[in-house]
Amino acid sequence: MQIKTYKIKDICDIKRGRVISKLYIKNNPGEFPVYSSATVNNGEIGRIKDCDLKGEYVTWTTDGAQAGSVFYRNGQFNATNVCGILKVNNDEIYPKFLAYALRLKAPKFVNYACPIPKLMQGTLAEIELDFTSKKIQEKIATILDTFTELSAELSAELSAELSAELRERKKQYVFYSDYLLNPKNWK
């Protein structure tokens, strides 16, 4: 099996999104997602009527507490100026595999020495990753997709179970607090 090592700058076009304010989102509602530095809701901060990007991309959070977070995007969307954008320009690279590989490596390159953590274009461009054949990249990405889905399902189920358990414990607490603090029950 042949392994090739590439710097991000050698396999991707690298850019950042544009400034899209909350006011712009409010005044231009539409169907196309706007991704920012947030990681909640998959990074989506709203939807607008226009679309800057179409196709398969990898995005990353450039600034803030979640700097270095990496996402695979496929479809029509927009990205703000605190969202870096990678467009694969090498036929040997599967974008989703790139996203998974970069997700592991990018956080190691975040600059925490600044007041606001950053992972800028120049730094990301120099990150080196190893790649196998595109066919194997696709298989690996499919396996990781399955694990990601199972993990999300399990998290949702556990969250629901824990919430239900917590509600029951709170009911018990109220019941026993009322009982134990009632002077009639102190006999």
Swiss-Prot record:
<keyword id="KW-0238">DNA-binding</keyword>
<keyword id="KW-0680">Restriction system</keyword>
<dbReference type="GO" id="GO:0003677">
    <property type="term" value="F:DNA binding"/>
</dbReference>
<dbReference type="Pfam" id="PF01420">
    <property type="entry name" value="Methylase_S"/>
</dbReference>
<dbReference type="GO" id="GO:0009307">
    <property type="term" value="P:DNA restriction-modification system"/>
</dbReference>
<dbReference type="InterPro" id="IPR052021">
    <property type="entry name" value="Type-I_RS_S_subunit"/>
</dbReference>
<dbReference type="InterPro" id="IPR000055">
    <property type="entry name" value="Restrct_endonuc_typeI_TRD"/>
</dbReference>
<dbReference type="InterPro" id="IPR044946">
    <property type="entry name" value="Restrct_endonuc_typeI_TRD_sf"/>
</dbReference>
<comment type="function">
    <text>The N-terminal section of a specificity (S) subunit of a type I methyltransferase (MTase); this subunit dictates DNA sequence specificity. The single R subunit has multiple frameshifts and is probably not expressed.</text>
</comment>
<comment type="subunit">
    <text>The methyltransferase is composed of M and S polypeptides.</text>
</comment>
<protein>
    <recommendedName>
        <fullName>Putative type I specificity subunit S.MpnORF289P N-terminus</fullName>
    </recommendedName>
</protein>
<comment type="similarity">
    <text>Belongs to the type-I restriction system S methylase family.</text>
</comment>
